[in-house]
Amino acid sequence: MIDYKLFKKIEKYAQLHSQSSIDHYRKRNQNTDKILINCIAGKIGEFECYYSMINAGYKIKSPPDLAIYPDDDKSHAADMICVGKNDILYENEKHIHIKTVSFNTFKNYGISFLIEANDRLVKYPKDNHFYSVMIEESLTSYRFGKWICSTDVIWMPPKMNLPSKLACYL
């Protein structure tokens, strides 16, 4: 669970991130009022996944990043890199892309997530890249929903009218 001190850091990160990325979000026709909320939720989901994995014995390269990058330096890299579990180091690191799902979305669509249709992993999935779906339980608490390897995803059009997105329903 996220404590107050970490929540305030996440909130500050989300404010700075949403301000630095406003043009990017507008190009994708995203509601600017929801950007801050989605940014907070995404980062909380990342920390919840990180703590869950650490508690289960996984070795993670570094905690979630709270740095703000300029537009030309933003990447689509994994949110986390898992290098092993307990005393075993993986030969091939596991790249984890964390997707947070609100409770209402979970209620309406089950364990699912959206991604930009032009995302690199859609065209070029890799067997060491995974999606981790984190489901909202409260403002500062998410639970693990499901893992899926990027090579196993069956992409579909979203049930909502979102032409630039693809959906994965698990």
Where on the chain are the PLM-derived regions?
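Nucleic-acid endonuclease domains
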Residues: 1-77, 81-170
